Amino acid sequence: TFLLSGICALIQTFICAFIGYGFAKFKFKGNGFMFIVVLVTMMLPHQFMEASMYLKFRYFILDSTGIYRALGLTTGLINTFAPLIILSLTGLAFKNGLFVFIMRQFYRGVPDELEESSYVDGYGVFKTFFYIILPISVPMLITVFILSFSWQWTDTFYVNMFMPGSNTLLLTSSRFWQTMPTTLETIKNAQLIGASNAGDIYAVAVRNTAGFLVIIPLIIMYLFCQ
C-alpha cells in the first residue's frame, strides 16, 4: 500500500502541477474549453467510466502482440499496478481534476514578472518551471501530495477494479498486489459471513481496530508535513 500510494502521489503531484501551470500561464486556443473538461471530470461518478477503463487495461495496446502472454500476464494489465500508474502519468487518476484546479488557481496568483525576469536571464519555459515556479510552489505541492496519498491509501474502488485477484488472501501469487483497504474489506466480509450473533461485538471490535491501524500512517504523515 505504501509503495503504490507513494508512487501514485509523487507522479500525480508533478503532473497536476505541470498541467495546472499550463492552464494558468499559457493562452492557447481551446484553453477555456479544456479546463471545463477538467472540471467535468470532478463531477462524473467513477462508476460512469468503470467498464470502459477496465476494458482498456484488460485489452491494452500490446495485448494483440503476445507480449503479455510471454510475461505471464493473461489478463492484460489487470492485477498489476500499471493501470493506476498510467492513469497518474496522464492526469486521469482519482481526484486529479481537483488537483489540476488547485494548482491552476495557485499559479494564477504568481506574478508574471517572475517568469519575465527569468526569460530575460535566458531561461526557457521548462527551466523557468523547474527552477523558479516549483520552488515557490512547495506548500501547495505538499498539500496536493497529502491529499493524493491519503485518497490512494484508502482507495478500494480502483484497486478492486484493476486488481480483482488481490481480493482473496488465499492466492499467494496475488499477495504482493494486496493493499490494506482491500485486506480490511476481506476481513470484514469474512466476519460478516462467518460471525454468529454472539460474535458480532467481537467482529465489530476487530474491524474498527483494523480501520484505526490503517489510518495511523496518514496521521503521522500529516503531522510530519505540517
Task: Give the role of each language-model region.
Residues 1-226:
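A structural signal for multi-pass alpha-helical bundles of membrane permease subunits
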